[in-house]
């Protein structure tokens, strides 16, 4: 039986945390003497009051979660956080439409980065900061953040971690999950601070550096300029952005082992990291060649633009330093492939994940060997660890579901009159949490405001399923989930 009281208790506490973050946005609005301060004060009061009501309902709950409770909690938290997160937009009037406000907020928390705002530069500083902060909070997971700072709040935190973490294997760097969470969030914070200081040193003002550092390390992609990082016309800023997008796409557990424990060889021997680097290098060289020969770019510009877009798409950040929509169409195919693949599991990026790519390639290799040696027992090993059959079954289930969901959503959009290329890349972008799309109607530098409202409501759960890796959400719609036994 689902324990709704403990779920409400945890959601109530999390809404207090969301109200706390809104307070910082209100401070930002007051500092800049802008009109959005009222919107944030009202929003945080609504959020805080609602959190109190949730806590009131769950006040006598036992502090323990079952596996079913964990799945329902994680999905509910992301939906409810997005619901309350849209209030600053609606109250201020920067987004007047409820559909657009919820879409923008869901896109923010899931770090998709698809925006319906045509001109972000007219927004006040508090609203801009809220957009960036949403992505930074969602980067490693809302509930995972809570496990790090308030471990006693989430009973059964291992089950919650399994429901919210990305990748087929949920690695822990310490026997205590709370310690793991604190270390991972420490690395995340260090990356964010280092990124912000680098941007500031390269010429950004403090507000620009703060916002771009949060959306870069969260691999979210929201920008405070319409032209994203292209606004600065600075190769130095481009290379800084590339560096921190790339680092944020690496498994944070691997970063911890390599940097904190000084085991540098572990990162070079890691199968997932090697595939990640290989895809980035291969795709960059291919696009660099195409830009040099077909667009007459000089070598440095071709290398920088190709590397930026490849890293941006594979880490599912979605920032841009040039309009890739004007590039040869073959580059769209390359970017579409890396967009679907994604970076490493256990990072802030979305997508299929390189670890699943490694597993898939090894299964295919073993299948060829099995044809030649029918009686051979061929285990799938990754980094010296045998992958159980259940994980391989889950791999193919996940792969099949992502393809089916992409095709289903694309078909609906094509019927709605959206061109084929846009329909496919929009679906891929949402299920992989990338943000930009490729096509003639909506390009990588355009907003998604032209989409019909009902399409936006279809894309919202798609973004959520992409962030929680599908199964966590879809299991709620199975009959067995709601059976008492």
Ranges and model annotations:
Residues 1-485:
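Membrane-proximal intracellular helices of multi-pass ion channels
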């Amino acid at each position: 039986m689902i324990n709704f009281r403990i779920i409400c208790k945890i959601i109530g506490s999390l809404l207090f945390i969301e109200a706390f973050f809104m307070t910082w946005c209100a401070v930002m609005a007051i500092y800049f003497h802008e009109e959005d301060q009222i919107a944030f004060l009202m929003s945080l009061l609504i959020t805080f009051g609602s959190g109190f009501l949730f806590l009131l309902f769950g006040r006598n709950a036992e502090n323990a979660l079952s596996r079913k409770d964990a799945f329902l909690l994680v999905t509910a938290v992301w939906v409810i956080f997005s619901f309350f997160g849209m209030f600053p937009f609606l109250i201020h009037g920067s987004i007047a439409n409820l559909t657009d406000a919820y879409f923008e907020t869901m896109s923010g928390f899931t770090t998709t980065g698809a925006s319906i705002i045509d001109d972000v530069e007219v927004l006040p500083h508090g609203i801009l900061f809220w957009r960036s902060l949403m992505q930074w909070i969602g980067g490693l997971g809302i509930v995972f953040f809570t496990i790090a700072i308030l471990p006693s709040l989430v009973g059964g935190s291992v089950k919650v971690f399994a429901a919210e973490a990305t990748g087929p294997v949920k690695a822990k760097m310490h026997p205590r999950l709370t310690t793991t969470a604190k270390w991972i969030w420490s690395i995340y914070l260090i990356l964010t601070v280092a990124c912000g200081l680098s941007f500031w040193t390269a010429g950004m003002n403090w507000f620009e550096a703060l916002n771009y550092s949060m959306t870069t390390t969260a691999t979210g992609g929201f920008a405070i300029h319409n032209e994203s990082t292209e606004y600065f016309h600075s190769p130095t800023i481009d290379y800084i952005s590339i560096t921190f997008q790339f680092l944020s796409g690496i498994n944070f557990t691997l970063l911890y082992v390599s940097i904190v424990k000084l085991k540098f060889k572990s990162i070079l021997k890691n199968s997932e990291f090697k595939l990640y680097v290989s895809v980035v290098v291969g795709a960059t060289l291919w696009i660099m060649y195409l830009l040099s020969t077909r667009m007459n770019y000089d070598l440095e510009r071709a290398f920088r633009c190709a590397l930026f877009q490849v890293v941006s798409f594979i880490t599912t950040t979605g920032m841009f330093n040039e309009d890739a929509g004007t590039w040869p169409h073959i580059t769209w195919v390359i970017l579409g492939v890396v967009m679907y693949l994604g970076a490493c599991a256990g990072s802030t990026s979305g997508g299929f994940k390189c670890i699943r790519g490694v597993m898939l390639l090894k299964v295919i290799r073993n299948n060829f060997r099995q044809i030649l040696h029918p009686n051979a027992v061929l285990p799938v090993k990754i980094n010296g660890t045998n992958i159980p059959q259940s994980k391989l079954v889950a791999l193919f289930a996940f792969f099949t579901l992502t393809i089916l969901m992409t095709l289903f959503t694309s078909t609906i959009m094509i019927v709605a009159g959206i061109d084929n290329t846009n329909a496919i890349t929009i679906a891929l972008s949402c299920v992989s949490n990338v943000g930009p799309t490729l096509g003639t109607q909506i390009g990588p530098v355009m907003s998604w405001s032209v989409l019909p409202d009902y399409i936006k409501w279809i894309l919202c759960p798609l973004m959520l399923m992409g962030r929680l890796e599908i199964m966590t959400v879809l299991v709620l719609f199975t009959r067995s989930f709601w059976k008492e036994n």
